[in-house]
Amino acid sequence: MHCERFLCILRIIGTTLFGVSLLLGITAAYIVGYQFIQTDNYYFSFGLYGAFLASHLIIQSLFAFLEHRKMKKSLETPIKLNKTVALCIAAYQEDPDYLRKCLQSVKRLTYPGIKVVMVIDGNSDDDLYMMDIFSEVMGRDKSATYIWKNNFHEKGPGETDESHKESSQHVTQLVLSSKSVCIMQKWGGKREVMYTAFRALGRSVDYVQVCDSDTMLDPASSVEMVKVLEEDPMVGGVGGDVQILNKYDSWISFLSSVRYWMAFNIERACQSYFGCVQCISGPLGMYRNSLLHEFVEDWYSQEFMGNQCSFGDDRHLTNRVLSLGYATKYTARSKCLTETPIEYLRWLNQQTRWSKSYFREWLYNAMWFHKHHLWMTYEAVITGFFPFFLIATVIQLFYRGKIWNILLFLLTVQLVGLIKSSFASCLRGNIVMVFMSLYSVLYMSSLLPAKMFAIATINKAGWGTSGRKTIVVNFIGLIPVSVWFTILLGGVIFTIYKESKKPFSESKQTVLIVGTLLYACYWVMLLTLYVVLINKCGRRKKGQQYDMVLDV
């Protein structure tokens, strides 16, 4: 006992020293600015900090590749499908078409005897259409439904403690006795909905799968996740490959689709190699039920800065598994399609909300670095502090550099994006990943200020979420983007004014013209390819019924 405690203390000290040393090392490399390669007039340079970032991308891609090889090898691994599984679907003001597709995909799941529990966040007449769709698709004679005035934590109008207790017991009994059940309950947010499903199921099943009501599951998705959990008893949770259902509906959903593939099949695949996936996404995840009930109450009652948390439910659920020392994994063999915002403002609000939960959970996650591989500490430091280094670089270039420095920065952003997307194209076997290089512009222009705004408003959760039946447009997300564009525009004007005081040399003019032409050609080429792709694939997708998950 004393020996284990001593080893734990040593690991805490070791991981803390490693994380601090890594951050100080990166900061020193950034401040010193040592250059390996440097041309005359600083037209091009490659320094220590750039070398570190390049090495990170290479190492991350390598481990992702190795993890995908492991996934392919496990494809032939036979398993006994004798463990009980329950699928929990969280629904809130869902688009009827998406909900119907979701439930139809649930009926096609190949895992035998899977229990389905859908909980609707809201019990008003306006929410009844979701229960009707559930009964229609799952079969009125094969499913149970219940309109609950309460939820497990709040009483409805006119309810007493006794009636609340009786109704809670009725919900639990209904869930346990039915193969498919739909519960409408008093509004309380997604976490309340998930809690109802977890609480009602109790310890009656071995594994709990989570799913959102806008998600279409691949028939083999449950089987593939069960396979991962069965292979290693120290794996507490596993997530699958989330693809975009409405990728051709707008430019923002298309770029999100390539970003999703990169996030899951490079970043999370790399994390999975070390058993420390940071977030098992809500559309497709599975947990050991025995672990789930060790922390479900603490997960529900999570507080931050004195307020109960109302977002970041899936990320905190993953962190709770990691906090117990269990591994979290990713498998590309389990797939699903899910809806993503097609309007820029709704996407921006979504990303801001996700950034809030990321930074909040980063602090919680740091307490468990010592229980996992050093890669978890390493990646947390790199991804957590990278936006701050990037902002410092941009402001410095735009206000203290030259016109060529700004142009070179833009070219470098696209070059790095092209290199990374080219590797992704090879790994996926699909040229569409080349458009990932366009996402880097979206990151620089919108995600970067959204992250800073998320930190500044991290304890505010009164905006950013809406159902899909009624889309709520919130313009507050434009504030940080507008401020960021003003800062950048001011830097460009200041640099041009400063440079205009001295006449450009002939060599400088040539470099600027060539650089501008290269940048313009890049955009013309990518935008042309985008238009061709949308005209070709967009029309085909409009008539597709999505009977199966397709990776196109």
UniProtKB/Swiss-Prot annotation:
Its cofactor is Mg(2+). One of its GO terms (cellular component) is cytoplasmic vesicle. Pfam families: Chitin_synth_2 (PF03142), Glycos_transf_2 (PF00535). Overexpressed in skin fibroblasts. InterPro entries: Glyco_trans_2-like, Nucleotide-diphossugar_trans. Residues 33-45, 396-402, 451-475, 532-552 are extracellular. The modification Phosphothreonine is found at T110, T328. The keyword Zinc does not apply. It is found in: Cell membrane; Endoplasmic reticulum membrane; Vesicle; Golgi apparatus membrane. GO terms for biological process: atrioventricular canal development; bone morphogenesis; endocardial cushion to mesenchymal transition; extracellular matrix assembly; hyaluronan biosynthetic process; polysaccharide biosynthetic process; positive regulation of urine volume; renal water absorption. There is a cross-link at K190 (Glycyl lysine isopeptide (Lys-Gly) (interchain with G-Cter in ubiquitin)). Catalyzes the addition of GlcNAc or GlcUA monosaccharides to the nascent hyaluronan polymer. Therefore, it is essential to hyaluronan synthesis a major component of most extracellular matrices that has a structural role in tissues architectures and regulates cell adhesion, migration and differentiation. This is one of three isoenzymes responsible for cellular hyaluronan synthesis and it is particularly responsible for the synthesis of high molecular mass hyaluronan. This is Hyaluronan synthase 2.
